[in-house]
Amino acid sequence: MKNVLIIFGKPYCSICENVSDAVEELKSEYDILHVDILSFFLKDGDSSMLGDVKRGTLIGNFAAHLSNYIVSIFKYNPQTKQMAFVDINKSLDFTKTDKSLVNLEILKSEIEKATYGVWPPVTE
């Protein structure tokens, strides 16, 4: 069973789309799940299944710790049911306007370094 990369992006965001396209190149190593963050957090979105308290905590954590990320990536281990935050910003080159904005070698390194169960995320 492969680990899963969960990509939280915004609709109509060209950077999010380019990151998603680039990450697809890792699909032989990971299952990839794309999540529209706005739809996810809507009142009737998928996050509503968590209940009001957990949902509110999740929204608060996103706002507090991930608001400076255009797109967020987590890796998930389905066997242990643990998640790890992947610091994608280290792999992005914002001077590029296509999927080459993601340096896949750096991203792979960040995915491997991401530690399960650490929250809030440790960023440099």
Curated annotation (Swiss-Prot):
Q: Which InterPro entries match?
A: Glutaredoxin-like (IPR008554), Thioredoxin-like_sf (IPR036249)
Where does the UniProt entry say this protein principally localizes?
host cell
Q: Which cysteines are joined by disulfide bonds?
A: C13-C16
What induces this protein's gene, according to its Swiss-Prot or TrEMBL record? Expressed in the intermediate phase of the viral replicative cycle.
Q: Which SUPFAM superfamilies match?
A: Thioredoxin-like
Give the location in the cell.
Host cytoplasm
Q: Which GO terms describe its cellular component?
A: host cell cytoplasm
Q: Does the keyword Electron transport apply?
A: yes
Q: Which Pfam families match?
A: Glrx-like (PF05768)
Quote the Gene3D superfamilies the UniProt record gives.
Glutaredoxin
Function summary: Glutaredoxin necessary for virion morphogenesis and virus replication. Functions as a thiol-disulfide transfer protein between membrane-associated OPG128/A2.5 and substrates OPG095/L1 or OPG053/F9. The complete pathway for formation of disulfide bonds in intracellular virion membrane proteins sequentially involves oxidation of OPG072/E10, OPG128/A2.5 and OPG088/G4. Exhibit thioltransferase and dehydroascorbate reductase activities in vitro.
Q: What is this protein called?
A: Glutaredoxin-2
Q: Which gene encodes it?
A: OPG088
